[in-house]
Design a protein with these regions (language model features):
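Feature for intrinsically disordered/low-complexity regulatory segments and propeptides
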Residues: 2-5, 9-72, 76-97
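C-terminal structured domains
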Residues: 67, 71-207
C-alpha cells in the first residue's frame, strides 16, 4: 500500500529543491521544464510552486501578476498600473508624404513621426521599500534581475513595462560628500531630502 499511498500525495513525493518527478512535470506547464531552463530563468523556481496552476492558464490578469510578485518577494505593497502612455515611432512606410496616396485627411493622417499609445505598456509599482530593499531592486542590485525575469515570465504578451520604486516614509537618507555617504548619485540622492518623494522610475529593459 505504501507506493500507492505515496503516489497520490505530493507532500510525500516532494524532494528538496523541487527536484522530484512530479514537480518537474508541474514546472513544464509554465515553460520551465528542465534544470537548464530553470537555471537560466534567474529565479528561485520552487517559490512559484503554489502558483503553477494559475500561471499555466492562457490569460494572466494584472491581479495574478501582482499576487505572484507579492508572494515571491514577500512584499505586500505591489500593484500594476495598466494602460500607461508611451510614444510609438511611426514607420517610414506609414508616414504621410506629399504626392503619395497613403493617408486620408480626417481619418488616418498623423502629423509627426510619433503617436501616443496606451495599449501596450504597464507599470509595476513596488511601494513602502526600506533603504536596503530599494537598493536591491535598482538595476545595480541583486533583486533587479529576478524581478524583471518574473515579470517577463508572468506576461503572456510582449508588452513594455516600467518599474517604479518608492521608499517608505522616513527612509530617505541625506546626501553627504565623502566616505560616509550612503546615497547613489542619480538613484538614491535627492536635494532637500526631507521634501523628496523617494521615487525612481526606469524601464524594465534597463541595463
Amino acid at each position: 500500500m505504501w507506493p500507492i499511498w505515496r503516489k497520490y500525495r505530493y507532500r510525500a513525493c516532494f524532494q528538496t529543491g523541487a527536484s522530484d518527478a512530479f514537480s518537474e512535470q508541474m514546472f513544464a506547464l509554465i515553460g520551465l521544464g528542465g534544470n537548464a531552463i530553470r537555471g537560466s530563468a534567474q529565479l528561485d523556481c520552487k517559490r512559484l510552486l503554489p502558483y503553477l496552476g494559475l500561471l499555466s492558464m492562457r490569460v494572466h490578469s494584472a491581479a495574478l501578476i501582482e499576487a505572484v510578485l507579492r508572494y515571491y518577494f514577500k512584499h505586500a505593497p505591489v500593484f500594476i498600473e495598466q494602460w500607461v502612455e508611451r510614444r510609438v515611432e511611426v514607420a517610414d512606410f506609414q508616414r504621410n508624404c506629399l504626392g503619395i496616396t497613403r493617408c486620408d485627411l480626417g481619418e488616418n493622417l498623423v502629423l509627426g513621426h510619433q503617436v501616443s499609445d496606451r495599449s501596450a505598456k504597464f507599470r509595476v509599482h513596488v511601494l513602502a521599500l526600506s533603504w536596503q530593499q530599494f537598493h536591491a531592486f535598482l538595476p545595480t542590485g541583486k533583486g533587479y534581475q529576478p524581478l524583471c525575469s518574473l515579470v517577463r515570465l508572468t506576461m503572456r504578451d510582449p508588452l513594455e513595462y516600467d518599474l517604479r520604486l518608492v521608499l517608505a516614509a522616513g527612509e530617505i537618507r541625506a546626501l553627504h560628500i565623502g566616505a560616509r555617504n550612503v546615497c547613489r548619485l542619480g538613484w538614491t540622492s535627492w536635494l532637500d531630502h526631507e521634501q523628496a518623494d523617494g521615487v525612481v522610475t526606469f524601464a524594465g529593459n534597463f541595463h
